[in-house]
Amino acid sequence: MICENVETFAEALPRTGAVAGLDLGTKTIGVAVSDGLRGVASPLTVIRRTKFTADAQALLKIVQDRALVGLVLGLPRNMDGSEGPRAQSTRAFARNLERLTPLPITFWDERLSTVAAERALLEGDTSRKRRAEVIDQVAAGYILQGALDRLRFLGRTE
């Protein structure tokens, strides 16, 4: 089920259970997961993209292995807030994934998440080679943490 906003996503989620954040690129999918109470996002892995069925199979294996209850996809908006071809591609991925899983799926604005991830890795004195290996999963962590913070805020205002 695709939830167009985090408020609807929050209503569709069970009270506890981990969720995943995804940073969809053309060559890779960065994956991060939360703890069961949805307080902290942790980078998990990178899926090398081939074709949708293989990508979805790898992702759904993570969903099953970790008993995830929802998915947050980074939505690459333009700096003016509009949606371009990359955002349309992300929405198409979500529609295709929706056919394969009953989990709620939502989007989170990913503007500057890769920049923030790169900055954090540089500050951590991570080598260029290592940065290239982990940047997508760290960016997924930033995307997921933003959504988790919003979910926590919504929980306080109910």
Swiss-Prot record:
Entry's EC annotation: 3.1.-.-
CDD domains the record matches: YqgF (cd16964)
Gene Ontology MF terms in the entry: nuclease activity
Pfam families, sorted: RuvX
GO cellular component, one term: cytosol
Keywords: Cytoplasm, Hydrolase, Nuclease, Ribosome biogenesis
Domain of life of the native organism: Bacteria
Classification via InterPro entries: RNaseH-like_sf, YqgF, YqgF/RNaseH-like_dom, YqgF/RNaseH-like_dom_sf
Main location: cytoplasm
Enzyme class: hydrolase
Disulfide bonding pattern of the chain: none
NCBIfam families in UniProt: RNAse_H_YqgF
Entry's family note: Belongs to the YqgF nuclease family.
Protein name (Swiss-Prot/TrEMBL): Putative pre-16S rRNA nuclease
Organism for this UniProt entry: Paracoccus denitrificans (strain Pd 1222)
